Regions:
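C-terminal partner/receptor-binding element of secreted or periplasmic proteins
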Residues: 119-142
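Hydrophobic membrane-insertion alpha-helices, especially the h-region
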Residues: 12-28
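N-terminal intrinsically disordered, cationic/polar leader segments
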Residues: 36, 72-88, 95-98
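N-terminal post-signal-peptidase region of extra-cytosolic proteins
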Residues: 81-82, 109-119
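Glycine- and acidic-residue-biased ligand/ion/polar-headgroup-sensing regions
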Residues: 89-106, 133
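Aromatic-capped interface at the extracytoplasmic side
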Residues: 23-41
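Short, Lys/Arg-rich N-terminal segment immediately upstream of the first membrane anchor
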Residues: 1-9
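Short extracytoplasmic/periplasmic juxtamembrane "stem" segments immediately C-terminal to an N-terminal membrane anchor
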Residues: 39-57
Length: 142
């Protein structure tokens, strides 16, 4: 039914098997040790407002179309009443911590962005969206 392989056929099969094994291992090695870099990108109405590292813990205040890095203790309560007023300003606090990003506070009317769980490398497929403010927070390859 099966005929025996000649020495030449065995040698060629061994080389093909070795090349396949080597390419598979090199792919795995590259995938594991490449340290795939990802960063946070914040868009407002399609315009890029912020790009920052996912590795560094930091907090940002986004008011209208201006971005400012703030301390972790700051929030909506640290702003003036006029700045918090949703009729005058669109305010979001974005926090990058422990490799995750979240919208911790917002003065939008539905608060969906605040109640959306933090996103990380593992859940990077799903962005955080604040529809009333036209804000999209996503994790992208750098």
């Amino acid at each position: 039914m099966f005929k025996k392989w000649s020495k030449e056929q065995k040698f060629i099969a061994a080389i093909v098997l070795f090349v396949c094994l080597l390419s598979g291992l090199s792919f795995l090695f590259f995938r594991i040790f490449s340290g795939e870099k990802r960063e946070v990108k914040v868009l407002k109405n399609g315009k890029s407002l912020l790009e920052c590292s996912l590795q560094k813990d930091q907090k940002f205040l986004i008011m209208d179309e201006e971005v400012k890095e703030v301390s972790f203790s700051e929030g909506l309560s640290s702003l003036s009443e006029e700045e918090r007023n949703p009729a005058k300003h669109e305010v979001n606090f974005i926090e990058v911590k422990d490799g995750k990003v979240s919208c911790t506070e917002s003065n939008c009317n539905n608060q969906i962005c605040v109640h959306t769980p933090p996103i990380s490398k593992k859940t990077a497929d799903l962005p955080i969206v604040c529809l009333p403010h036209g804000l999209i927070i996503e994790i992208v390859h750098s």
